[in-house]
Swiss-Prot record:
GO terms for cellular component: membrane. Residues 420-457 form the EGF-like domain. This is Integrin beta-like protein B. It comes from Dictyostelium discoideum. Belongs to the SIB family. GO terms for biological process: cell adhesion.
Length: 1941
């Protein structure tokens, strides 16, 4: 049980120790991202929970900042990931991506990222109160792409690792590397100087640590883990050592013995191994069990799949419970507890994303309910980098094929452009900004300057006229009681604005700062002592008001001759209870100069460490009211308002009406008078703080330049509970005010303040500008201006062009000179068009308006450049006539040339030459034909187009300077010329005798719709009996009564053409009885509907005689196929034929075939043609060879039917043949217009016009490039080789470098290019893909001088430097070196210069400058910080670029952005006054230089007479001072530029210029001047000191006794004591002797002044105010006389002080007096008759009548020793020689075991009974003595002197022992007796020793009596108990004694 209590105590001690500060553990790791210079950094830290009060997992906490190693840093806001409530720590993590500067290709750069702060735990056995420094080595590698770049190692540890003192402890640092697992090395850190725990080693290969601590306590350690490429991380944690009781190993000689260290186990066989403990544990700690991952194990987690692991631990004791604590768990892990109790199990699960790739080391610890812990278990979760991220797979080409919106360039680890986040979501709209895209982006739109809104579509600008007073921007602080704390407000003129202020005040304040200002010049030390004594009550009372209360302390002294206005003692956050106790006032006086108000003014404005977001109170304690003038009172009030500090004033024992009046007048604060008691002032001060915190008082700061704009404040009120409300502050800007950048400060007294920067409208500005334009050209321009308030500007012309100069039109085409009062927007584009050939310079002027006010006017100068004008041509239209030549007369003109110098070129004659001959001077016209005046051409049409058409032929004129005109057209109108039809019919036509037949007349025409048939002539037979007629049903010759007989010149009605064929059937009958050849005939023509008549056709008629006839037989044509649109007819001809059994009709052997083939049904999808003449087949003598031609575009099956008839018109059956038309691929076609462009044209994309009958895709290519003209493909890529594919069948042109144009640059170029196209088809029969015909296209470039181009330029330079710069300008005609600039305005905040000096208004108006000629120098001290928003460019100028022809670019601007280079500024005191022997808190606050970003400090030197400390406020843990031992010492840990130090002068030294401190302030690479703070150590009257020297007891020995470690005077009853002491004072101004007084007169005894040695008693000191004068020897004396006859311990106490001339009192020294009784020695009485005995051996004799007495021993014990000694010496004889016995009774006795001796302790009566009878028997004859020794043990003396006041008495009885005179006697008797005596002596010694030990326990006597060595000798002589008592009278402490022994 005792051991358990012991261990619990040790454990609790460690808990207390570990609360000393807040840092526990840290490590930093990093990983690359898809951009090599964007590094993801992860910081894992552990802190003490109590520093934050309490934390919860997932909570956000902030602490310190991280330095990225590139002069940038950021504050850390971390997420709590785990916590240990038993040991009161938690872990937190921060992760962020930092962008480092890009590196050149294939280069690396190393950075060190650091998290550093102070201070470590004070009680560490190493590194106590030192900085912690957590770092990682980062490598930026531009040579590799993600994910191949290096990653840092990753490690982890429990924040506190428990180890056993004096035993070997083993634990392992587990680390993992995403790149290579076996390449890590381990060692103690070398990145920061720190002490490692002694006895600890680290294995460099596997991270095994061995530690044999020899002390209990806490150590810190830091291990560095480095990979093969040099990237490193560290892990910093604590080692807690404790002692544990175990047992020794069985191999030891003291096996199973209890032990606490290995060294206590001896002779063990396994000694010497650093891995084995010979002292092993008794209790078994809990252990991790399966399925917990093994130590060092790596678990792979796949991406996008849920994975899990378990932690399970168990204690072997059923009565205990187990719990698991983890460190730095990834926030994505989900936790589930699966079991609790003796076994504890938890489950973690995770479905990681690609963004989580990396390694995560998890550390865990198992604890049982008794406090025993397991070893640390660490393992790794590893999320592997796949070859392709986010679901991508590797393709056959080795590249990643990504899904979704992941980018193959980054192996699917990065989003494509336009997407963001871990799911690559589409970026939302971002109209005027840059979207934060990419896998690490959040999709938010980062707006360009002037835009806001989620999509940056809302302009920050608006018209001044529409603007209302509003908040432009504001800053809130979470910890503030009021918000916003800063705001920018726009105030419209003469309009009041109510500014909202939100108050959020909890019932218990969250933060409270109390600065205690104490009057150090109280009227007495006792008065000031009440301040000391009341401090703890004050602190504890005030702490109840807030969750976090911090205190500071300052002092002032109103002592007139040595006043101190204000002296800081301890900054906010200090332990003021200790600080006030350490402070020693320099004076005590009721005199006062009344400077308490002045002190409060300085204290309230001093840098004492006020915390942001706290309620601020200054408590002033003074015992005298203030005296001050009105100015001082006003300064006091303004200082409090400016800092928002509320005063509480305590009149300490004195009324303070002036203070009350000021507080009442100010309207805030609290005053009260308190009694001069510790309880009253502390209670009332606390009540005052409570009172002021319950009042809301609003004040406007007088020290702010914008105070006059605050017109009203909220009414104050009292609050009693939590308050959430919004109040309003009224602001109003007068119409006219001369306040520049007004700022208002409004304080809610104590609770904080809001700073309001007030903006109002300012006049816009415009600048002079200009532009130039070529003669007869045009130019566009905009009106521009700027407005400091970002208002929307509109513009108005104030002067216009002369009407002869030209016209300026708006975008709507309206002449602006007709709109004299129109305002235009800034986006309006104006067009200037000069009058034709007008070349004079013109100007216009304009103003800008912001909605409220106009700018001053600016001028735009317009310069017209005279240039050669291109000639002009006029288009012409002619009408062509088929087969007739027509003349074409062209016309052209030129401004400079006569007609004879103008030539005309036809750009592309081919559109006309396809229809006929196009000639100049009887020669065909080509593109190179030069046509001179009079420009006469001819054209003869030879091709008849199918329909009317107009054809255009482009031509241009060229002047003598080879300048071409724009393109004109020769338009030729063609009409189609009708062609006569073709008539046909079958001839001869057979007819039977006396029979009739039908004759089919056919007309074929391709350009007509109908025809009429004309019977020109006919013969009716050789006998004239034949008849030609027509039946009403055409083709039906059976009519008789309705016959219409043909007449000559008969004209039929119109017959429509069907498939280009029209037929008319006429009838013929005969009455001939026999066969007659050419019996009759008919001749006809056909006339189309356009009046053209065909040639005549004659049809003969044969009369065939009657004969037996059989119908013929048709020969069927099998199904066959033809190709669609295929023209190779020979391949598809077929023969229609038949056979006939009648040899007259058909005899193949005789070559007779009189059959007629007849088409009975024509095909529907095509046409049958005769092979011999290509006419359409209808009927024809057999065999009839035909061709089937499908109609254009058709395909599929078609049929036609046919038969044969014999000469007797007998018909065969009708046969039908199917023709399959097979679809084929058709050749594509392509066309393109000729194109010409100028140097002023933009790049237009041109497209080829393609077509394909089959609808196939057509891909075109360039097969010949134009000369001297750059041609670009569809993607805008220059074509350098042909053939070159055009992916979109589009192209564009640009001029080559002019220098490449032949014969001369900047000349016109005419050229052509050739393209063809290929279709894309799957067809292969009869052919596959087909290529179009080559198309030659003309292209021309017309040179027009192109205006130069420029763009806005921003010149970057540093403040107070000059920068040569080059204007942005380029021109295709003019080399850059020849371009010049025209400057229209000069900079306003700097100067332009060249080699000849500074430019001025005259020089810029009269000349131009080369692009690189000028240098800009800003005015001294000016930078961008001096602009309205502290960020805009400092200066600007307007300019235009001129080419060598004088043509100008548009006007543009050069901005001069002057980077502020203002180092931080120190505005504090350069001299501080430090009070002697006083710690001075020195706060150095660096103000960020204008435009700067941070403040760091380097203390360069210190003279070192005193001591300089770095000071760290640890919150509730107080303040830590770290002495600075070497210089320079750098700090950069403050985000606000405040650095705290403390100065302490050496003791009792002072003087002006006592020390100097030099330092510089740093911002990145900016270093301030060296600042020097001079330390004056002000002499402060130091209190004197008093020292006790000695005392002398008068009436005694007179010996002077020096005071030792105590101040006690021991004196006897009825004596007196003289006390001697001395007073000292180090102050040089202490001239006279110090005064001395007795603080309190003792109640017993009397104090006298010392007179002299003869008559020592001087005057009685009855009054404590009576002074004791210093004696001539420099000492002070007094005499103390106790009351006669009285005694006592602590009889009296006399406190003494000395006092200097300033009233300062030394610390008191007290003399204690013990008045002692005189101790009376004991007396032994032996009857005279009993003083000698004679006896024989072996006989017993009784010694009697022996008594003793000790007169002053009443109830206390005394000691008696009885022994047998020799006759002449004190040697105790053995009890074997002589022995004795006594009756001990109630006494406590102890006999010696071998000697004849016994010692007894008891009351006097008890011991007298012991010695009343002593029975003696001797074995050995001889002369002996019975010795009786009595010791009073000094009990009558004070304890303090008891050891020196033992008194004793000794007496003897003589023993004469002889042997009996008998013959049988032998020597054995002597032997026996001698043995008895010897035994008795030995027994006596043992009894004495035993009694000594017993007495030592029973009653603590002095060391001299009870020393352990007293009984270690061979005899009793060495024991002081056996020292013989001398005569009592010889002892000066004895009373007189009559006893003689």
């Amino acid at each position: 049980m005792k051991n358990i209590i012991k261990y619990l105590f040790i454990f609790l001690c460690f808990l207390i120790i570990t609360e000393a500060t807040h840092f526990r553990y840290g490590t930093i790791s990093w990983a690359p991202t898809t951009k090599y210079n964007n590094i993801k950094i992860t910081v894992n830290l552990a802190f003490r929970t109590g520093y934050w009060g309490s934390v919860a997992i997932g909570q956000q906490i902030s602490h310190g900042n991280i330095d990225f190693g590139d002069n940038t840093k950021t504050g850390l806001t971390m997420t709590v990931t785990s916590k240990d409530t038993d040991n009161e720590w938690f872990t937190a993590t921060w992760s962020g991506i930092h962008e480092y500067s890009p590196q050149p290709t294939a280069q690396t750069k190393n950075y060190i990222v650091v998290y550093k702060d102070c201070c470590r735990i004070s009680t560490l056995l190493n590194n106590g109160d030192q900085y912690w420094h957590i770092s990682a080595g980062i490598q930026i590698d531009s040579s590799n792409a993600f994910p191949n770049v290096n990653w840092s190692p990753v490690t982890n540890m429990m924040p506190i690792v428990r180890v056993i003192a004096n035993k070997n402890n083993n634990f392992r640092i587990i680390a993992n590397d995403q790149n290579k697992q076996t390449a890590l090395s381990y060692k103690f850190t070398d990145t920061w100087t720190m002490d490692q725990p002694p006895g600890m080693t680290v294995d460099s290969i596997n991270g095994n640590c061995w530690f044999l601590p020899t002390k209990e306590g806490l150590y810190s350690t830091q291990i560095k883990v480095t990979d093969a490429l040099g990237a490193y991380v560290v892990v910093d944690f604590l080692l807690q050592t404790y002692t544990e009781v175990g047992k020794c190993d069985p191999t030891c000689s003291n096996a199973d013995a209890s032990c606490t260290s290995n060294s206590q186990c001896t002779k063990c066989s396994n000694t010497g191994s650093n891995s084995i403990n010979t002292c092993t544990n008794i209790q078994s700690p809990p252990e991790f069990i399966i399925p917990t991952p093994k130590n060092g194990e790596t678990i792979l987690f796949p991406i996008d799949k849920s994975s899990e692991f378990y932690l399970s631990c168990k204690t072997p004791y059923a009565s205990r419970t187990a719990s698991i604590t983890t460190s730095s768990i990834p926030t994505e892990l989900a936790l589930t507890t699966t079991s609790t109790g003796q076994t504890n199990s938890i489950k973690y699960s995770w479905s990681p994303k690609t963004s989580s790739i990396g390694s995560y080391v998890i550390s865990a610890l198992c604890k049982d309910s008794s406090g025993l812990t397991s070893e640390v278990r660490s393992f790794t979760i590893r999320i592997e980098k796949p070859e392709c991220g986010n679901g991508g797979i590797k393709g056959g080409d080795g590249k990643c094929v990504c899904i979704g919106n992941w980018d193959t360039i980054y192996q699917c680890f990065e989003c494509k452009d336009g997407f963001y986040g871990d799911k690559c979501t589409v970026l939302p709209p971002c109209k005027n900004g840059v979207p934060n895209g990419g896998v690490n982006g959040d999709g938010k739109c980062l707006c360009n300057n002037g835009w806001t809104g989620s999509d940056c579509s809302v302009s920050n600008s608006q018209s001044c006229g529409s603007m209302t007073s509003s908040i432009l921007s504001s800053s809130n602080a979470v910890s503030s009681y009021l918000n916003p704390i800063k705001a920018q407000v726009y105030l419209a003129n003469d309009k009041k604005f109510d500014f909202p202020l939100v108050l959020s005040i909890p019932s218990t304040l969250s933060k409270l700062d109390v600065y205690l200002l104490v009057d150090a010049n109280m009227n007495s030390a006792a008065t000031f002592l009440n301040i000391y004594n009341g401090m703890d009550n004050f602190i504890s009372s005030v702490k109840k008001f807030a969750e976090d209360t911090q205190f500071g302390l300052g002092i002032f002294s109103d002592y007139p001759s040595n006043s101190i206005t204000f002296q800081p003692n301890s900054n906010i956050g200090s332990d003021i209870s200790s600080a006030i106790r350490e402070f020693k006032p320099s004076s005590y006086s009721s005199s006062s100069n009344g400077n308490s108000l002045l002190a409060a003014t300085q204290a309230s404005s001093a840098q004492v460490g006020w915390n942001s977001g706290s309620f601020k109170v200054i408590v002033i304690i003074t015992d005298i009211d203030y005296q001050a003038n009105p100015t001082e009172k006003s300064s006091f009030t303004n200082s409090l308002i400016d800092k928002s500090v509320v005063p509480v004033v305590i009149g300490f024992g004195s009324p303070i009406p002036n203070w009350g009046a000021s507080i009442s007048s100010n309207g805030f604060g609290y005053t009260v008078q308190s009694a001069i008691t510790s309880g009253d002032w502390s209670t009332k001060a606390a009540a005052g703080i409570k009172a002021v915190s319950s009042k809301l008082v609003y004040k406007s700061g007088e020290m702010a330049n914008g105070k006059s704009l605050v017109t009203s404040l909220p009414i104050g009120e009292t609050i009693t509970q939590s308050t959430q409300k919004t109040v309003t502050i009224s602001l109003l800007k007068p119409a006219t005010t001369n306040i520049e950048s007004p700022v208002a400060k409004v304080s809610v007294m104590g609770y904080g303040q809001t700073v309001i920067s007030i903006n109002s409208n300012r006049q816009p500005t415009v600048s002079n500008s200009g532009f130039s334009v070529d003669q007869n050209s045009f130019a566009t321009f905009k009106l521009t201006g700027s407005d400091a308030d970002l208002n929307i500007l509109t513009f108005k012309f104030t002067s216009f062009l002369d009407s002869t100069a030209g016209i300026i039109t708006s975008s709507s085409g309206v002449d602006v000179s007709t709109q004299t009062n129109t305002f235009y927007s800034s986006t309006e584009v104006f067009k200037f068009t000069p009058k034709k050939n007008y070349i004079a310079t013109s100007s216009i002027s304009f103003i800008a308006n912001d909605g409220c006010v106009d700018s001053t006017a600016a001028t735009i100068t317009i310069t017209i450049n005279r240039i050669n004008q291109a000639p002009e041509c006029q288009p012409i239209t002619i009408n062509a006539l088929l087969n007739q030549q027509v003349g074409i007369s062209l016309s052209a003109s030129d401004f400079e040339d006569v007609a004879s110098k103008i030539a005309i070129f036809v750009s592309n004659p081919s559109p006309l030459t396809v229809y006929g001959s196009f000639n100049y001077q009887d020669k065909p016209i080509t593109t190179t034909t030069t046509i001179n005046n009079p420009w006469q051409l001819t054209f003869k049409q030879i091709v008849n187009p199918p329909s009317a058409i107009s054809v255009g032929v482009p031509f241009k004129s060229r002047d003598s300077a080879s300048l071409y005109s724009k393109e004109c057209l020769i338009t030729v109108n063609f009409v189609h010329t009708n062609e006569a039809p073709i008539s046909s019919s079958l001839s001869p036509v057979p007819v039977n005798p006396r029979d009739k037949t039908t004759i089919t007349l056919t007309s074929t025409d391709y350009d007509s719709t109908s025809a009429t048939f004309n019977i020109k002539s006919f013969t009716t037979g050789t006998d004239g009996k034949g008849t030609f007629y027509i039946c009403p049903q055409l083709g039906d010759c059976s009519c008789t009564t309705t016959q219409i007989k043909l007449q000559k010149n008969y004209v039929s009605s119109a017959v429509s053409y069907s498939t280009n064929i029209a037929n008319l059937g006429i009838c013929f009958s005969n009455d001939q009885s026999s066969q007659i050849t050419d019996y009759a005939s008919v001749t006809f023509t056909s006339t189309d509907n356009q009046g053209l008549e065909s040639l005549p056709v004659t049809v003969n008629i044969n009369v065939v005689g009657t004969r037996p006839n059989s119908p013929p037989t048709i020969i069927s044509i099998p199904k066959y196929s033809v190709f669609q649109d295929y023209k190779d007819y020979d391949k598809s001809s077929k023969i229609i034929d038949g056979t006939d059994t009648d040899q007259d009709d058909y005899d193949k052997s005789q070559g007779v075939n009189n059959l007629i083939a007849v088409i009975t049904e024509k095909p529907k999808k095509g046409t049958l043609y005769l092979k011999n003449d290509g006419s359409v087949a209808s009927n024809s003598p057999a065999p009839m060879e035909i061709y089937y031609v499908p109609n254009p575009g058709t395909f599929g099956d078609d049929t036609y039917s046919y038969k044969v008839i014999d000469t007797l018109q007998a018909s065969s059956t009708i046969a039908t043949t199917t023709v399959s038309v097979i679809q084929i691929n058709h050749k594509p076609s392509v066309s393109a217009d000729s194109y010409s462009f100028t140097s002023q044209d933009v790049q237009f994309e041109k497209s080829l016009v393609t077509s394909d009958f089959d609808g196939d895709q057509v891909n075109c290519q360039v097969i010949a490039l134009p000369n001297q003209i750059s041609m670009y493909d569809s993607e805008g890529i220059l074509i350098t080789q042909v053939p070159a594919k055009l992916s979109k069948n589009s192209y564009s042109f640009r001029l080559l470098d002019p220098s490449l144009i032949i014969p001369s640059p900047f000349s016109n170029v005419q050229s052509q290019f050739t393209v063809n196209c290929l279709d894309v088809t799957s067809k292969t029969d009869p052919f596959g893909p087909l290529q179009s015909d080559d198309l030659i296209v003309n292209v021309g470039y017309i040179y027009i001088n192109t205006p130069p181009k420029t763009k806005t330029l921003t010149v970057q330079l540093d403040q107070d430097t000059s920068k040569a710069f080059t204007f942005n300008g380029d021109d295709i005609e003019t080399p850059t070196s020849d371009l010049k600039v025209k400057i229209f305005s000069l900079p306003t905040n700097g100067r332009l210069s060249n080699q000849y000096g500074y430019l001025n208004g005259t020089s810029i108006s009269s000349r131009t400058y080369y692009l690189n000629e000028l240098t800009y120098t800003p005015n001294a001290g000016l930078s961008n910080w001096d602009t309205e928003d502290n960020n805009s460019p400092l200066d600007k100028i307007s300019y235009a670029v001129l080419d060598k022809g004088g043509l100008s670019s548009e006007t543009d601007l050069v901005y001069f952005s002057v980077r502020p280079r203002n180092p931080p500024i120190y505005t504090g005191k350069d001299e501080i006054n430090v009070l002697q022997n006083t710690r001075y808190p020195l706060t150095i606050i660096g103000e960020i230089g204008n435009g700067g970003s941070s403040v760091a400090i380097s203390v360069v030197s210190f003279t070192g007479n005193g001591t300089l400390y770095e000071t760290f406020n640890m919150g509730s843990e107080g303040t830590i001072d770290r002495q600075i031992s070497s210089y320079p010492v750098n700090r950069s840990d403050s985000l606000v530029g405040s650095y705290f130090y403390a100065y302490k002068p050496p003791h009792n030294q002072y003087g002006d210029d006592f020390d100097t401190i030099t330092f510089v302030l740093i911002d990145g690479d900016l270093v301030s001047k060296i600042y020097t703070v001079t330390v004056n150590v002000i002499h402060v009257n130091q209190p004197p000191t008093i020292k006790l020297i000695s005392y002398k007891v008068l009436g005694g020995s007179g010996k002077e006794i020096e005071f030792g470690s105590n101040s006690t005077v021991n004196m006897n009853i009825n004596t007196m004591a003289l006390v001697k002491y001395i007073g000292n004072d180090i102050d040089k101004d202490q001239v006279g002797p110090l005064g001395s007084k007795v603080l309190n007169i003792p109640l017993t005894g009397t104090i006298y002044k010392f007179n002299n040695e003869t008559t020592p008693l001087g005057a009685i000191i009855k009054d404590k105010n009576l002074n004791i004068e210093r004696n001539d020897d420099g000492f002070y004396y007094f005499v103390f006389v106790p009351i006669k006859g009285s005694t006592g311990q602590g009889y009296a106490r006399v406190p003494l002080i000395v006092i200097d001339d300033g009233g300062l009192v030394s610390p008191s020294e007290s003399v204690d007096f013990n008045v002692n009784n005189i101790n009376i020695p004991p007396v032994i009485t032996i009857d005279k008759e009993k003083r000698s005995y004679s006896l024989l051996t072996n006989l017993t004799i009784s010694a009697t009548k022996i008594t003793f007495d000790d007169p002053d021993s009443k109830n206390n014990d005394v000691s008696i020793t009885i022994s047998i000694v020799g006759e002449k010496d004190e040697t105790v004889v053995p009890f074997s020689n002589v022995s004795f016995t006594v009756t001990t009774g109630k006494a406590t006795c102890k006999p010696d075991s071998t000697l004849s001796s016994i010692t007894c302790v008891g009351k006097k009566s008890e011991l007298n009974k012991v010695i009343s009878k002593i029975d003696i028997i001797a074995k050995v004859a001889g002369n002996y003595r019975l010795k009786v020794f009595v010791d009073d043990l000094g009990y009558n003396s004070p304890i303090s002197i008891r050891s020196s006041t033992h008194l004793n008495a000794t007496d003897y009885v003589t023993l004469q022992i002889s042997s009996p005179e008998v013959t049988t006697q032998n020597s054995s008797n002597k032997t026996v007796l001698s043995g008895a005596i010897a035994g008795a002596a030995a027994g006596t010694a043992l009894i004495a020793a035993a009694m000594w030990k017993m007495l030592r326990k029973a009653a603590p006597p002095t060391d001299a009596f009870f020393d352990e060595g007293a009984f270690l000798g061979d005899g009793v002589n060495s024991n002081p108990m056996y020292q013989e008592s001398k005569n009592g009278g010889e002892n000066p402490l004895y009373l007189a004694s009559n006893e003689t022994l």
